[in-house]
């Protein structure tokens, strides 16, 4: 049986700020239902690549396709439809501090759907329950922990039932236990919803726990050095930079592998 067609295809992508090139000649694909890790050292362009994938930055050259359809060659209306398929969890959680958790999650539902207020309340309760925050509808972001804010941000990212989820450093600022719980939640959501998940992270425990595949970006050569299963890259890559990155603190992360 042939493998499924890629959910996301990156073809000959060059990312730049004006004449300053961040990464060039990026070509890889992401399969449906895969948890794909964007990894590499500081300053390599991980978050810049994420901004390209969610339509916030236009490539200097190259293309990004979703289910075979070019994002930037599409009409504005078609691009808007593609964007509706995305859910994004930003590093800070990006919750509105003046709104309750319920109001934060209801915001995109009121903006982009025709659901009644009662139906919106039901969806909000369901999304909060999915991330373990049932009963926290009336809490404000400042009243809950950092890990809970990340989960609330994830609930909002799932509000419109996206089939592609993007996470920017989801474990940033979390203690190891909260980080592991968030990893478990990401796996559970992928398995239950069948979503494709793209994660920017430098956390080895998360990379090895949730990553099915990934791309390694190098800040020195300004291009990708490899694509593949992070554990396989750690164990068999001939590239010293990849082995060094993925074997940091190996003693602490052996159990996560």
Tell me the role of every PLM-derived stretch.
Residues 117-136:
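Conserved ABC ATPase "signature" region
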Residues 140-144, 148:
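Conserved ABC ATPase signature
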Residues 159-163:
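A short, proline-enriched helix->beta-strand linker immediately N-terminal to the Walker B motif
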Residues 165-168:
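Catalytic Walker B motif of ABC-type/P-loop ATPase nucleotide-binding domains
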């Amino acid at each position: 049986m042939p493998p499924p067609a890629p959910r996301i295809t990156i073809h000959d992508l060059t990312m730049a700020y004006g004449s300053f090139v961040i990464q060039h000649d990026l070509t890889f694909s992401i399969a449906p239902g895969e948890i794909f890790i964007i990894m590499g050292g500081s300053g390599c362009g991980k978050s810049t690549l994420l901004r390209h994938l969610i339509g916030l930055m236009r490539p200097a050259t190259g293309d990004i396709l979703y289910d075979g359809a070019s994002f930037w060659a599409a009409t504005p209306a078609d691009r808007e439809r593609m964007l509706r398929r995305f859910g994004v969890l930003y590093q800070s959680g990006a919750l509105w501090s003046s709104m309750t958790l319920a109001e934060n999650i209801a915001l995109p539902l009121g903006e982009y759907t025709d659901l009644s207020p009662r139906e919106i309340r039901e969806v909000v309760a369901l999304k909060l329950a999915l991330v373990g925050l049932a009963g926290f509808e009336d809490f404000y972001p400042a009243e809950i922990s950092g890990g809970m804010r990340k989960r609330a941000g994830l609930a909002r990212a799932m509000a419109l039932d996206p089939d592609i989820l993007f996470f920017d450093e989801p474990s940033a600022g979390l203690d190891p236990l909260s980080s592991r719980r968030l990893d478990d939640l990401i796996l559970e959501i992928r398995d239950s919803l069948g979503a494709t998940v793209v994660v920017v992270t430098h956390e080895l425990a998360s990379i090895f726990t949730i990553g099915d595949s990934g791309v390694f970006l190098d800040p020195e050569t300004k291009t990708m050095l490899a694509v593949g299963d992070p554990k396989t890259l750690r164990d068999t890559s001939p590239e010293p930079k990849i082995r060094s990155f993925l074997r940091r603190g190996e003693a602490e992360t052996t159990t996560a592998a």
